[in-house]
Amino acid sequence: MSVFEIVFSPTGGTQKVSGLVAGALDKNTVTVDLTDSGLDFSAVSMTEDDVAVISVPAYAGRIPAVVADRLGMVHGNGARAVLVCVYGNRAFEDTLVELEDVAKHAGFRVIAAVAAIAEHSIARQFAAGRPDAQDAAQLAEFAQQIQQKLLAEDASEPSIPGNRPYKQAGGHRMAPEATEDCVSCGACAAACPVCAIDKGDPKRAAGEACISCMRCIAVCPRGARKLDPNKLSAVSQMLSKVCVVRKECELFI
């Protein structure tokens, strides 16, 4: 049995949660990076003896469309899947059920699902520092329960909350822009999951292709990519009404 960690984590929060879950199942995991636009995902194949921890962020209550496309190319071949949805302390809404459907279509058998919290990728003051020690303890406990289910060869499907049809994909696209501090090093263009930034001139970006994942901001060594401050302020004000009360991690098994 091999444990695969299939993860989409543009700013690192989802990776932290995913690592806590997958690492508790097996210290030696095989990583499939869904942010890597150059990877041939159709070449990724598992067996029914394998386990895949599939971890994605919630974007306005849905999985990123690029995740559905890339995960859909993977050959699950009956491997057991643990779904992990990470959100910024607002709500995960239909993310897990959509991920469940995509995973099943790719040939996985879903045996468990986790909803966890990490620092909000846009308004970083919300859920700052998460996953924290309390989250890590909860996720370790979840992983133990999942491990017991695997050892018992229990293939029953969990009851996962969410709606079908899913909520309409929405949210206003917020594309970061280069500031005068940009030196065109190209780090952002190389890291963009959807190739929305011109590699020849990183100050140019295709706003319509941007998925607002904030990876370009996260990887810029000079802090030279920013969101429009007025738009960021408006989003922060909206989120302040729904992100104040601490949400806890949840296990569906």
Task: Tell me the role of every PLM-derived stretch.
Residues 2-36, 42-173, 230-236, 240-253:
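FMN-binding flavodoxin-like domain, especially the glycine-rich phosphate-binding loop
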Residues 178, 183-211, 215-232:
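Iron-sulfur cluster-binding cysteine motifs and their immediate structural context
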